[in-house]
Amino acid sequence: MAMNLENIVNQATAQYVKIKEHREPYTAHYNALKDKVYSEWKSSAVLGKLLKGSTLCGGYGDKLKVSIPDEFDLLIHLVFPENDKIIVKADASKPGNVILDMTKVMEIIGSQEHNKPVFDRLQKIVNNKKQLLEDKLNSFLESIMTQTLNKMGNQIEVAGRISHLQYKKCGPAHTIFVKGSCKYSVDFVPAIRLSAAQVVLAPEQRIHFGETLYWDAIPKPMKPAKTDNTSFTSSFYEAERRLLYGKQFLKPAIRLMKQNRNVKNKANLKSYHIKTLFLWQVIQQDPSYWSNSPKDIFIEMLGKLADSLALTPKKGKLPFFWDPKLDMFAQLTDSQRTDLYNHFRKCEYTFRKDNGNVNDCTENNVHSSFSKNTTYKL
């Protein structure tokens, strides 16, 4: 078979990106841990009443994970009694965030004996306006997680083998680090599940939400941390999954970009940045666009990513898909942006050059873009 850039990229994908041999033991171990933790949480007098299932999200849930599945992201859905009575308001001071007014919820459940534990807890985690407080909710959940791991002896036995567990609060996630036959982490991310009727999106974004039934408000701490914080991050994972579904080579192209980011240690580019870049393209491109090869989509997206990172002649930006007033690159410093821009622009140039003229260096160029185990430096 004559070698061309597409063949070489496909070869690199099979070798570095699609690694399946480790997935079964990792997922089996993860499922055992998830079920044990969830079972302990269900026994809590308050949290047990709020838990309404979970959703595997992130790279693994989106089927975008590259290499070994050593990170799992799990949305833990919390639903309060009379949840539909939560009054949701957009946070005018922080685009993409919402404020949750629990007034009507508390008025109703305050006289219900069976909901007394929840009502008593709510009184401790709202302010005088009955707005839910992110930091107080997270402190409560942190105490539950600490108790859970203490009950488990900070370890779990799976298939006759003991693994040690360490808990750490990481942003909105309550993270368990597992050390044993499988080494991985699980982000348990609390998510207050809200209905479509409670959406506060602008009309254009509401169209893209479509017929999705639910969305979530995530208690994500502010940076720097803020006491009595009423602002929750909006999350539209189900709607995003629907938007990305059925786009033939979209996900393979995302995997290529994530793998390149990983091996080149460009950690300032988050997975959600990449996902957002592609979400915008989903609504801008004709559906047939995604039948192009992963290689062609990848090259074009490298260019669009570099454009959004540029500082000159016009500063680029990456608007949050659900509230474009929020620039997702705004928190990056100029030096961080420049570093990312230079890398992805150079990567785009290299792939475009090799796409038109495969030569003796092409194979090394491609493999070094997706693996650390090659000598060629992009």
Curated annotation (Swiss-Prot):
GO CC terms in record: cytosol
- Cystine residue pairs: none
Q: How is its activity regulated?
A: The enzyme activity is specifically activated by double-stranded RNA (dsRNA). Recognizes long dsRNA (>30 bp) with no preference for 5' RNA phosphorylation.
> Binding residues for GTP, per the UniProt record?
D187, T233, S234, S235, F236, Y237, E238, A239, E240
Q: Which Gene3D superfamilies match?
A: 1.10.1410.40, 3.30.460.90
Per the UniProt entry, the effect of R241E is: Abolished ability to activate Sting
InterPro entries in the record: Mab-21-like_nuc_Trfase, Mab-21_HhH/H2TH-like, MAB21L/cGLR
- Biological process per Gene Ontology, one example term: immune response involved in response to exogenous dsRNA
Sites binding Mg(2+) sit at E71, D73, D187
Give UniProt keywords alphabetically: Antiviral defense, ATP-binding, GTP-binding, Immunity, Innate immunity, Magnesium, Manganese, Metal-binding, Nucleotide-binding, Nucleotidyltransferase, RNA-binding, Transferase
* Cofactor entry: Mg(2+); Mn(2+)
According to its UniProt record, which reaction does this protein catalyse? GTP + ATP = 3',2'-cGAMP + 2 diphosphate; GTP + ATP = pppA(2'-5')pG + diphosphate; pppA(2'-5')pG = 3',2'-cGAMP + diphosphate
Q: What is its EC number?
A: 2.7.7.-
Q: Which GO terms describe its molecular function?
A: 2',3'-cyclic GMP-AMP synthase activity; 3',2'-cyclic GMP-AMP synthase activity; ATP binding; double-stranded RNA binding; GTP binding; metal ion binding
Binding-site residues for ATP, renumbered to this chain: E71, F72, D73, Y237, E238, A239, E240, K258, S271, Y272, H273, I274, K275
Q: Any idea what job this protein has?
A: Nucleotidyltransferase that catalyzes the formation of cyclic GMP-AMP (3',2'-cGAMP) from ATP and GTP and plays a key role in antiviral innate immunity. Synthesizes 3',2'-cGAMP in a two-step reaction through production of the linear intermediate pppA(2'-5')pG. Acts as a key sensor of double-stranded RNA (dsRNA), the presence of dsRNA in the cytoplasm being a danger signal that triggers the immune responses.
Assigned protein family: Belongs to the mab-21 family.
Protein name (record) = Cyclic GMP-AMP synthase-like receptor 1
UniProt organism field = Drosophila melanogaster (Fruit fly)
